[in-house]
């Protein structure tokens, strides 16, 4: 079971969201087990690593841990389903979790915005350039962190800081910014009249993929 292409598998993702989602982990038969609690729902991610032959023992340990309660597993890769079905009971239900699918784009498509599919995005970008001819786009450096955090705080306040989901996202975002160098992540920002108006944070995932966290 070594099909780890999802954004939830990055250390950065697990680290910055650990408080909001009460993320904890354990090792069982060389498998990494990640437990998450979100909106009072507790679930585990697909077990990572280990030898396929040991997965049934891991499932049995999970059953004991959940003390007879149903186990909800998320972040399952399509390639893993046949193996999981062999380890689980016939009453186990599998369902698509489309709301949590990752969006996957080719770099060249986003860089060029060619074709009808990206027409609206290209128009939006062109309108922004026309309205803000003096905007400055640059990579985020440590000198920009304070300004980015201030902008994130303002964004949360404008969106409704009392909403739990926004407070959670702000907490994760500030974790990423405050640990920018240690996490080895990268980012870019836009300033208009010297003031940060937008930024993004991501990291290289493997040889042919990057993950955009925010």
Q: Model-found features: residue ranges?
A:
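Short, glycine/charge-rich beta-strand/loop segments that flank catalytic centers
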Residues: 69-87, 98-102
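Short acidic (Asp/Glu) patches
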Residues: 58-59, 86-91
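Conserved donor-binding loop and adjoining core beta-sheet/short helix segment
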Residues: 9-79, 191-214
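Acyltransferase donor/substrate-recognition loop-hinge adjacent to the catalytic core
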Residues: 90-163
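Short, conserved active-site entrance elements at the starts or edges of catalytic domains
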Residues: 143, 147-195
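Hydrophobic, proline/glycine-rich low-complexity stretches
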Residues: 1-6
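Amphipathic coiled-coil/heptad-repeat helices and related helical stalk/stem segments
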Residues: 55, 121, 172-173
């Amino acid at each position: 079971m070594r099909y780890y292409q999802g954004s939830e598998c990055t250390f950065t993702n697990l680290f910055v969201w650990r408080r909001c989602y009460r993320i904890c982990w354990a090792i069982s038969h060389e498998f990494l087990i990640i437990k998450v609690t979100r909106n009072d729902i507790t679930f585990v991610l697909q077990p990572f690593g280990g030898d396929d032959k040991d997965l049934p023992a891991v499932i049995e340990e999970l059953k004991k841990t959940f003390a007879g309660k149903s186990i909800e597993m998320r972040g399952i890769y399509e390639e893993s389903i046949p193996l999981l079905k062999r380890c689980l009971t016939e009453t186990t239900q599998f369902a698509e979790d489309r709301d949590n699918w990752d969006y996957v784009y080719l770099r060249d498509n986003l860089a060029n915005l060619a074709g009808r599919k990206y027409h609206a995005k290209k128009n939006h970008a062109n309108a922004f350039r026309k309205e803000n001819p003096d905007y400055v786009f640059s990579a985020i450096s440590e000198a920009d962190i304070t300004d980015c955090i201030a902008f994130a705080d303002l964004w949360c306040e404008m969106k409704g800081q009392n909403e739990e989901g926004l407070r959670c996202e702000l907490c994760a975002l500030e974790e990423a910014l405050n640990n920018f160098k240690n996490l080895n992540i990268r980012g870019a920002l836009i300033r208009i009249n010297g003031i940060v108006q937008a930024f993004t944070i991501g990291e290289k995932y493997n040889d042919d993929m990057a993950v955009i966290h925010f």
